[in-house]
Every structure is written in structure tokens, then in C-alpha cells.
Swiss-Prot record:
Protein name per the record: Ribosome-recycling factor
Keyword Transport set for record: no
GO MF term list: ribosomal large subunit binding
Gene Ontology BP annotations: cytoplasmic translational termination
Keywords, in A-Z order: Cytoplasm, Protein biosynthesis
Chief location of this protein within or outside the cell: cytoplasm
Function in brief: Responsible for the release of ribosomes from messenger RNA at the termination of protein biosynthesis. May increase the efficiency of translation by recycling ribosomes from one round of translation to another.
Gene name of this polypeptide: frr
Family the UniProt entry places it in: Belongs to the RRF family.
Amino acid sequence: MQSEKFDINDLKRRMQGASQALQHELGGLRTGRAAASMLEPVQVDAYGTHMPLNQLATVTVPEPRLLSVQVWDKSMVRAVEKAIVDSNLGLSPATEGQVLRLRIPELNQDRRKELVKVAHKYAEAARVAVRHVRRDGLDTIKKLEKSHEISEDDQKRLDQEVQKATDSAISEIDQLLASKEKEILTV
């Protein structure tokens, strides 16, 4: 019996949101390897407003250590170049017409270790978010059982479903972290 007041799918969606947020945060970590997602946080002063870089240019990865930014509007090349330099990513563009080429410098071992620590912090924050969702779900189930809207057997079954969803979400977070850690530490 599925209670109308308790939706396991909503809990799963909220847990999935935590791992999607982690994926986005990990995407912003520099690994010494070129990735178009590195430039996602870059905001460009264009047409009187701040715009994401991906609304003004196409970012490609022609080589493992090179990003290519093809600016669509010739008048925006300088603004895009300035935004990349000001973004504190440690990248300096070489401009050729409407194309900016960004060499990705090698990361030293200390910087790699720092990035791994940051990745672990992001992953722990995601795990905590998942645990909060689990706690909310278990509290809701307990209230439903106390008010006799569900039976004790249903409570136990729903508790197990919530735990299974939690284990699955934590496992996904651990896989994302392991993958990013390997990517960062690969020289």
C-alpha cells in the first residue's frame, strides 16, 4: 500500500538532485585535462548584461590539453577574452581572429592533492544532503504510522525502501568521487 502522503519517488528525485549538484561542482574542478565544462562558470559582460560564455561562443576540446573557444560575434572577442582572464582559472587565451585557444597547464602534485580534498568536501556535502532527505522521509513515515494512516508493516517496508534509495544515492556519489579523483591524480 503506497500512502498518498508519502512519495518515495519524490525522495529519490531529491536524492538524485544532490548527486546532480555534486556532478556539476566536480565538473568545475580543473584536472589538468581540457574539458568544456571548465568554462561553465565564466560570465561575460556582453550587450549590457552578464551572460554565460556558452551563450556567446562554442567551446570545444581539439586536444587533451587545449580548449578552443569560437566566438560567434566578432565584437565580443575582447569581452570573452577578458572574462576568461578575470575568471581566476589560470588560463591565458591566445586569440586568432574569432577563435581563442587556451592551453591547459600541467598541475603539480600539491595542487592535485588540494583538488582531491576539495572533491571530497563536495562529495561529503552531497552525502549529508542525501542523509537529510532520508531523515525527512523516515520522519514522515513515522508520523504516518503514529497517526495510524499506515500500518507498522507498511512503516517497516517504507523504511527499507528509503534506506535502499539512500544506499543507491550514496553509492552513486562515491562512484562520481572515485572517477573524479582518478581523473585528477592521472598525470
